[in-house]
């Protein structure tokens, strides 16, 4: 061990970093592994004040997002992607070495990585066979749990968590823990948002992003919706200038009437492509099951997923391997691309009839 490594915190030395799509790499021309929108938006920078520091919480961005989400501006915090929101909640509410977070695998990996980075215990309540919450398991672990993360629609399974279960969880956790509902993909099923419950449940927190339906993954702009008291606590630990001036500029444009209309058109396009791809995949011999989805990706179980993954990788089609997630043996996640990209996937898979493990 080098002297530098010895200086590092023990938990950081032992940390396995989150394996993002870009970290995993690849040399493809069909990128269907990061749940990105397939086309770049046509925004142009309009602000020319790069010599000045930006606002900590850009007023125009906050106001426009509040109007879009149907909440009050004091219930909104903007950050460097929803990932920063995940981290801020742990920093503000969890004592390292004492408190815990809880999440429900299979799910998004950054909840665990963020907690481990700050020396906070990670607890899990594995989802049931239908990928719904195991409320009994969660309730049994509430003592010492400060933050509960639930992803709905869930990444990578694509399903919504039952609303009655979310309400039961909120009632169960009241006075004990924050319940954080990650709505990164909510634009694909807006009727399922829990933002309408914010005034009813002061411990409810909602995470949002411009990375998915708004087609701005490269912008790194996310939002936390919560009770004003929670927002004020998060403002104590957020960096003084979380959003650069160009990011705030583009985010405000994306949240204009025209920007929101374009986002809704994106959603219609992706939803249509998802239906087409789901139907096309069901008759392919190497596929065991195509799971229903309320998002911009499909989870698919293959007869021999490692072979499928490598074969498509070699053809420049990059998917996301989910085999290491609990209960997802044999599964790959396919982002919904444009029609050409979806057709490439189908053609590549049709060339693999009868593939076996």
Curated annotation (Swiss-Prot):
**Pathway info:** Amino-acid biosynthesis; L-histidine biosynthesis; L-histidine from 5-phospho-alpha-D-ribose 1-diphosphate: step 7/9
Keyword Transferase included in the entry's annotation: yes
- Catalytic activity as recorded in UniProt: L-histidinol phosphate + 2-oxoglutarate = 3-(imidazol-4-yl)-2-oxopropyl phosphate + L-glutamate
Q: Which family does it belong to?
A: Belongs to the class-II pyridoxal-phosphate-dependent aminotransferase family. Histidinol-phosphate aminotransferase subfamily.
Which cofactor(s) does the record list?
pyridoxal 5'-phosphate
What EC number(s) does its UniProt record assign? 2.6.1.9
- Top-level EC class as recorded in UniProt: transferase
According to its UniProt entry, the protein's GO biological process terms are: L-histidine biosynthetic process
Which key words are in the record?
A: Amino-acid biosynthesis, Aminotransferase, Histidine biosynthesis, Pyridoxal phosphate, Transferase
User: Per UniProt, what is one GO molecular function of this protein?
Assistant: pyridoxal phosphate binding
What is the name of the protein in this document? Histidinol-phosphate aminotransferase
Pfam families given in the database record: Aminotran_1_2 (PF00155)
Per the record, residues carrying N6-(pyridoxal phosphate)lysine are 212
- Presence of keyword Nucleotide-binding: no
Q: Which InterPro entries match?
A: Aminotrans_II_pyridoxalP_BS, Aminotransferase_I/II_large, HisP_aminotrans, PyrdxlP-dep_Trfase, PyrdxlP-dep_Trfase_major, PyrdxlP-dep_Trfase_small
How does the record describe its quaternary structure? Homodimer.
- Taxonomic lineage: Bacteria, Pseudomonadati, Pseudomonadota, Gammaproteobacteria, Enterobacterales
């Amino acid at each position: 061990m080098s002297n530098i490594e010895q200086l590092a915190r023990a938990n950081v030395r032992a940390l396995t970093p989150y394996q993002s799509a870009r970290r995993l790499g690849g040399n493809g021309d069909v990128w269907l592994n990061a749940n990105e929108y397939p086309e770049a938006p046509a925004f142009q920078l309009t602000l020319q004040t790069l010599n000045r520091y930006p606002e900590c919480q850009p007023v125009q961005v906050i106001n426009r997002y509040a109007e879009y989400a149907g909440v009050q501006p004091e219930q909104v915090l903007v950050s460097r992607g929803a990932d920063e929101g995940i981290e801020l909640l742990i920093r503000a509410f969890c004592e390292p070495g004492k408190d815990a977070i809880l999440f429900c695998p299979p799910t998004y990996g950054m909840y665990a990585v963020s907690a481990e980075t700050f020396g906070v215990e990670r607890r899990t309540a594995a989802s049931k066979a239908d990928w719904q919450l195991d409320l009994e398991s969660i309730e049994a672990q509430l003592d010492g749990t400060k933050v509960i993360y639930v992803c709905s629609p869930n990444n990578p399974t694509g399903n919504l968590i039952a609303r009655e279960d979310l309400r039961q969880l909120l009632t169960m956790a009241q006075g004990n823990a924050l319940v954080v509902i990650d709505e990164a993909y909510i634009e694909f099923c807006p009727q399922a948002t829990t933002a309408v419950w914010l005034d009813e449940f002061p411990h409810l927190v909602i995470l949002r992003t411009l990375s998915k339906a708004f087609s701005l993954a490269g912008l790194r702009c996310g939002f936390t919706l919560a009770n004003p008291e929670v927002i004020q606590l998060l403002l104590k630990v957020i960096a003084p200038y979380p959003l650069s001036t160009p990011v705030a500029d583009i985010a405000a444009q994306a949240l204009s009437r025209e920007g929101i209309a374009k986002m809704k058109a994106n959603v219609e396009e992706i939803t249509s492509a998802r239906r087409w791809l789901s139907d096309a995949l069901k008759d392919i011999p190497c596929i065991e099951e195509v799971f229903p989805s309320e998002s911009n990706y499909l989870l698919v179980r293959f007869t021999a997923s490692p072979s499928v993954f490598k074969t498509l990788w070699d053809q420049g089609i990059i998917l996301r391997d989910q085999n290491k997630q609990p209960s997802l043996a044999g599964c790959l996640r396919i982002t919904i691309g444009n029609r050409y990209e979806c057709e490439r996937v189908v053609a590549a898979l049709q060339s693999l009839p009868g593939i076996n493990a």
